Amino acid sequence: MKLILKENVDNLGHIGDIVKVAPGYARNFLLPKGFAIEATEKNAKALEHAKRHLEYKKNKVLEAAKQLAAKIEGLSLSIAHQAGADDRLFGAVTNMELAEQLKANGIEVDRKRIVLAEPIKQLGDFTATVKIHPEVSATLKVAVTKA
């Protein structure tokens, strides 16, 4: 019996695969649990349509992420912080402060997506990585000045 898998099934296949299984395995396990549907022409067309739609949405999200990355790359943040005599900051510049600065510039990014290689505890120029999408990240320039 030919089936189209709706879920990943161990030792059988992945989502969207057309597999041939014993009729009893299909009737008693795969179909009742919703792991598969019969491989009719109608179901195959519906599956292809769903795959195309998913691919389109994925590409649209990726394009938006690339545009946001380009915006962030062209931006340089300037943060004024209190510092001591040897240019060491009282405290540190955190990813939360960077997220607030980005928000003030019209770019909304979750603070957890901003990655600092090490805490910023001195005056000077630094970079931070913003992970916008699993495939797209941007480098943010940060200048820390004395308040």
From Swiss-Prot:
**Name of the protein in question:** Large ribosomal subunit protein bL9
* Domain of life of the source: Bacteria
One Pfam family name is: Ribosomal_L9_C
A GO term, aspect molecular function: rRNA binding
- Organism (species): Geobacter sp. (strain M21)
The family assignment reads: Belongs to the bacterial ribosomal protein bL9 family.
Question: Would you name any one GO CC term?
Answer: ribosome
- Function according to Swiss-Prot or TrEMBL: Binds to the 23S rRNA.
The protein's matches in InterPro entries, at most eight in alphabetical order, are given as:
Ribosomal_bL9 (IPR000244), Ribosomal_bL9/RNase_H1_N (IPR009027), Ribosomal_bL9_bac/chp (IPR020594), Ribosomal_bL9_C (IPR020069), Ribosomal_bL9_C_sf (IPR036791), Ribosomal_bL9_N (IPR020070), Ribosomal_bL9_N_sf (IPR036935)
Gene name as annotated? rplI
An annotated GO BP: translation
- Keyword set, alphabetical order: Ribonucleoprotein, Ribosomal protein, RNA-binding, rRNA-binding
Q: What is the lineage of its organism?
A: Bacteria, Pseudomonadati, Thermodesulfobacteriota, Desulfuromonadia, Geobacterales
